[in-house]
């Protein structure tokens, strides 16, 4: 294996560990993902979250603490953290999965939690959405329930390019539950053909 390949793999593993750390620390802030860019003076870190204020913390205390951990534990040189609020949050699979999971924690029945989320997603303009909840839903046996609205492609270019997907796990009294959300974005399908009106001449 070449030195370049090793470097790429090492960097990929580091970013995966960084993402897992930020996910744990910023779950209440509806953390979605982060980007890392090398700069002449250090590393620029862009954190995308649903509630930026919880990332920053009171007087910036939380974001300063995170920066210290990134530098000390992960070797990120002089991290400069910016926080970006995720737009159109009802169309973001990760944030909607968080919302369903929190509803389950509050004791909302899983069907109601899923249907409320589906209504919000479709009202926001999605072409389709799918929510899968797994765990001990109504008994001591583990099972899975799926709720779908509209059209959500499973494969091909639409499934890869136009579907946002996320999974969130939450620990309840009966055990671990999984919430998977897939959202078909309100975009034109690749095979959509627009037929314009024909003007007759003569």
From Swiss-Prot:
Gene Ontology terms describing biological process: translation
GO molecular function: rRNA binding; structural constituent of ribosome
SUPFAM superfamilies listed in its UniProt record: Prokaryotic type KH domain (KH-domain type II) (SSF54814), Ribosomal protein S3 C-terminal domain (SSF54821)
Limits of the KH type-2 domain: 18-87
Cellular component GO terms held in the UniProt record: cytosolic small ribosomal subunit
Domain of life: Archaea
Alphabetical UniProt keywords: Ribonucleoprotein, Ribosomal protein, RNA-binding, rRNA-binding
InterPro entries reported in the protein's UniProt record: KH_dom, KH_dom-like_a/b, KH_dom_type_2, KH_sf_prok-type, Ribosomal_S3_C_sf, Ribosomal_uS3_arc, Ribosomal_uS3_C, Ribosomal_uS3_euk/arc
One Pfam entry name: Ribosomal_S3_C
Family of this protein: Belongs to the universal ribosomal protein uS3 family.
Subunit: Part of the 30S ribosomal subunit.
Function: Binds the lower part of the 30S subunit head.
Protein name: Small ribosomal subunit protein uS3
Protein's organism: Thermofilum pendens (strain DSM 2475 / Hrk 5)
């Amino acid at each position: 294996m070449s030195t370049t390949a090793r470097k790429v793999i090492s960097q990929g593993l580091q970013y995966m560990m960084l993402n897992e750390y930020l996910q744990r620390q910023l779950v209440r802030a509806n953390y979605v993902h982060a980007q890392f860019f090398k700069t002449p003076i250090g590393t620029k870190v862009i954190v995308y979250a649903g509630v930026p204020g919880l990332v920053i913390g009171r007087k910036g205390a939380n974001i300063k603490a995170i920066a210290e951990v990134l530098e000390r534990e992960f070797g990120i040189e002089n991290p400069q953290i910016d926080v970006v609020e995720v737009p159109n949050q009802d169309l973001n699979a990760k944030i909607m999965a968080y919302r369903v999971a929190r509803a389950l924690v509050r004791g909302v029945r899983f069907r109601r939690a899923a249907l409320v989320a589906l209504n919000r997603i479709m009202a926001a303009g999605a072409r389709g959405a799918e929510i899968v909840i797994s765990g001990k839903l109504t008994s001591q046996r583990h099972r899975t329930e799926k709720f779908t609205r509209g059209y959500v492609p499973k494969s091909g270019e639409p499934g890869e390019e136009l579907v946002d997907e996320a999974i969130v796990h939450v620990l309840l009294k009966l055990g671990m539950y999984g919430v998977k959300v897939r959202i078909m974005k309100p975009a034109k399908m690749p095979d959509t053909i627009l037929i314009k009106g024909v003007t007759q001449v003569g």
